[in-house]
Each structure stands twice: as structure tokens, then as C-alpha cells.
Amino acid sequence: PEAAQPALSGINLEIQPGEFVLICGASGCGKSTLLRQCKPALSQHGEKSGAIYFNGKAIEELSFREQSEKIGFVMQDPEMQIVTDKVRHELAFGLESLGTDNRKMRVRIAEMASFFGIRDWFDSPVSALSGGQKQLLCLAAVTVMQPQLLLLDEPTSQLDPIAAGEFFNTLKRINSELGTTVIITEHRLENLFPMVDRVVFMRSGSIVSNCSPADAAEKLRGDDEFFSVLPSSVRI
């Protein structure tokens, strides 16, 4: 709040329903700050200017219920997000908080358990899960709310490469099969790059490039910071 320079500056970004968008950049570039502005309940304090609209409505005007139902958020550390001790309780927590009908809740939970392939550990304690399973549980617990927009802040930062790849594949299924709009910040680009529709590169709180993965190499060829982190298949 007392920083001399704004955390974000000159941001102009429009995302269409059903898009899969990757936001990347060095630590401190503002990507996580930007992501959190899309869910007011999680946005940072401080002076703000500009406006964000969700389905034509100023995002600050969304009720807590609308935010909870329509905008999902997955954090870096699953331990900071999981609130119950059992897998099935975690899947039910959000729906119970909104007073969802019991029958509807059971149907949704069963569908998500099947979709995410977690039926084998549905009755397990959360403490028995691996890091990858815990993050998958966080994703499932958010998706069971049937959000229109899914925000993910470096969700694979604590996962090994195999678990990260599986997580990305599940995320792509959510986007393509459920039609959910996905915005993700990530530092692992190799597997994720071919899956997304658009890549947004940020530096010092501003967007420096906003393009398709196919155009990224050409647009960033003279930018050593970003060109060097592109997947090798794109740089060729």
C-alpha cells in the first residue's frame, strides 16, 4: 500500500469465455497481483484505479455468493487452501457453505470424483495424500462449484514434473470439456505452452506481450529475458 510505484500499470486485457490464458514473467512482475484482482475477496489492499468487468458487471459489485460460485481460485500451496481433514469433506465444503441442496450436492461430488479420478481415495484423510493429490483435490473442490472462471496462481510450484504434467492435463480437460475459462500464472512452460490459447508476458507491473503461443517466438525474439524461457520447440 505504501509502495512508491504502482504494482500494476497500464493493464488492458480482455479474455473471452472459454479461453485458456497463461500469464508469465519473473518473480515480482505483478502476475499474481493481477490474478488476485479478478477475485475481490483475495485482492490486496491499497489504492486502486481502473475497472475489471466480469460478464459485463463490475467485479466489485459481485456478491460473495456470486464470487464463490462463478470465480474459482487455486493457490500455490494446497496446505493453505485445504480446510477439512477428509477428501469427501473437502469436496463438499464449498457447496455446504452456500446451502446447496443435499441431493444436488451428492450428484456434483460424485461427478467430480469420477472426472478427477479420485474415487479410490475419496474416503481417505487429507494427511495421507501426496502433494500432487492435495493440489488435485484443491482443483476438484473448486471445480465442483461449477465456476465460469478458474484462476490458478503457480499451482505446480511444489509438485514434481510428473505430478505437474498430470495436473496440467486435468486442467486442459476442465477447459475443453467443461468450457471453463482458465487463467493461470506459471513458471513451467514446457508442457503448458502448447495447451493454452494465449500467453501474456509481464514485466514491472505491465504487459509487454499478449499473443498466441505460435506467435510468441517471433514477437519476443529480441527480448532476451522472455525468449530464453520459451519452450525449445517454440524457439526453433
Predicted regions, residues:
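Conserved beta-strand-loop-alpha-helix hinge in the C-terminal portion
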Residues: 206-230
